[in-house]
């Protein structure tokens, strides 16, 4: 019997990696432990060398859906550390932060089933998630990715949620945003005067009814608010353009599912694959010749930005909606996407009629990603929700910590340290005080994530 210490780096926190390791060890009858630290995941195995090799092979070939393994370091320990079983230990702190933050991900099929299953205690719950889906980047304060370090820290688990959270064989084991209507954040519908109209599923149903009747709503998404209205209603789409002072720029449309998109557009297999991916980005596709949604959504062009409902709240909303919805980032011109109801009321009270909110704070804003398929390849026009933060491995190791800032337009920041390159989500044009503040806040956020103080700062020379 030997002992092996395995260090795994990459997107390995908040993606069900520890329970995956636990169940893999149980399957192979291996004793030891697994834990998180601020570099990634550590695994100790008590087993024969061939058993360790088989374990690592399966770890590499079949990791959790949302995981991305960048490196595996294996060390044979001469002093054997005997373990009586395999356990999941508490997170530790190494003072060397390099773990990769997972992007937010769209709701998985299992959670969609949960919110539509009348026998499930999460039936109709708009903030359902598990280790395979839901918010990550948008709710995290710092690493390691534990509940105490997220905007869910103030919500204490009820008995039902705690059972799942503490069961290593459950897909919600240590899913940090896990909650239900009893113990978690809830959805509330407000009018523009900040008066509460409805809560929970009644709020969702009423919001859908208001959209069907031609009103404009601000609806909280994963990384910020959307401005939403009926995509088939010329009058309300035109009113939104007037309210936002956006006469011609195309809007995106959110659909219930891929079949709904096919009703209005001509999509190829690659576009369908991207639309249905776990990231659920906006994809630019060709309109059908008899395109029957409002011509004011994307005037004078033959393409439209489409995306599929990606949160449980969206899916519940489409239960009651009659048509696809126009969904665009809630912001003023040249300002970042809005994260809070109070900011919507302060800045967009003349734009929206109602607000559908929930009380899980968005700590880090993140727009929708935008993709165009060119020669069967995904070209990212906006790298954001689902894809960012983006981690890349450098071919060479840098001995300097480098912060790259880009230029004034379409701004994004990146950090380079060791052999890691971390790209932030899309920030946007830096033409307002608010966008510059967002830019500076993003820099401070990423510095905090990685205990990063740059040795070198670089930017584009042009303005």
Model-flagged regions — what are they?
Residues 435-447:
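Short, well-ordered amphipathic alpha-helical segments that serve as non-catalytic structural scaffolds
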Residues 217-218, 451-462:
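Short glycine-rich phosphate-binding loop at a beta-alpha junction
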Residues 1-177, 181-188:
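Intrinsically disordered, low-complexity, mixed-charge
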Residues 3, 157-158, 182-192, 220, ...:
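Gly-rich Lys/Arg/Thr-decorated short loops/hinges at beta-loop-alpha junctions or inter-strand turns
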Residues 397-420:
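Gly/Thr-rich phosphate-binding beta-strand-loop-beta motif of the actin/hexokinase/Hsp70
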């Amino acid at each position: 019997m030997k002992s092996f210490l395995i260090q795994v780096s990459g997107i390995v926190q908040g993606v069900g990696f520890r329970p995956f390791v636990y169940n893999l060890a149980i399957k192979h009858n291996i004793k030891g432990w697994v834990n998180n630290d601020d570099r990634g995941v550590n695994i100790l195995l008590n087993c024969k060398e061939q058993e360790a090799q088989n374990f690592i092979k399966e770890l590499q070939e079949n990791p959790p859906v949302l995981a991305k393994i960048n490196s595996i370091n294996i060390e044979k320990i001469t002093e054997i550390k005997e373990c009586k079983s395999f356990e999941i230990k508490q997170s530790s702190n190494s003072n060397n932060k390099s773990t990769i933050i997972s992007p937010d991900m769209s709701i998985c099929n299992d959670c969609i089933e949960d919110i539509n299953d009348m026998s499930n205690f999460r039936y109709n719950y708009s903030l359902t998630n598990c280790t395979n889906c839901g918010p990550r980047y948008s709710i995290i304060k710092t690493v390691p990715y534990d509940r105490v370090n997220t905007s869910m820290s103030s919500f204490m688990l009820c008995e039902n949620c705690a059972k799942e959270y503490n069961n290593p064989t459950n897909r919600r084991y240590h899913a940090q945003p896990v909650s239900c209507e009893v113990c978690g954040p809830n959805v509330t519908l407000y009018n523009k005067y900040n008066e509460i109209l409805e809560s929970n599923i009644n709020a969702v149903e009423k919001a859908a009814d208001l959209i069907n009747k031609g009103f404009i709503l601000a609806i909280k998404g994963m990384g910020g608010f959307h401005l939403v209205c009926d995509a088939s209603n010329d009058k309300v789409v035109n009113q939104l353009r007037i309210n936002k002072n956006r006469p011609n720029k195309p809007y995106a449309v959110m659909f219930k599912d891929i079949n709904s998109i096919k009703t209005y557009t001509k999509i190829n297999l690659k576009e369908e694959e991207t639309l249905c991916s776990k990231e659920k980005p906006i994809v630019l596709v060709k309109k059908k010749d008899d395109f029957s949604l409002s011509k004011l959504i994307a005037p004078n062009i033959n393409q439209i930005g489409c995306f599929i409902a990606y949160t449980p709240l969206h899916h519940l909303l489409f239960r009651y909606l009659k048509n696809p919805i126009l969904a665009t980032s809630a912001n003023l011109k040249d300002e970042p996407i809005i994260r809070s109801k109070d900011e919507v009321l302060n800045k967009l009270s003349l734009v929206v009629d109602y607000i559908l909110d929930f009380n899980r704070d968005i700590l880090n804003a993140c727009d929708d990603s935008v993709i165009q398929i060119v020669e069967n390849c995904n070209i990212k026009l906006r790298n954001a929700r689902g894809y960012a933060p983006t981690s890349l491995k450098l071919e060479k190791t840098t001995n300097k910590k480098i912060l790259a800032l880009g230029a004034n337009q379409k701004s994004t920041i990146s950090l380079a340290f060791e052999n890691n390159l971390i790209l932030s989500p899309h920030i946007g044009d830096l033409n307002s005080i608010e966008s510059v503040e967002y830019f500076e806040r993003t820099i401070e956020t990423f510095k905090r994530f990685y205990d990063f103080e740059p040795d070198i700062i670089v930017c584009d020379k042009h303005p």
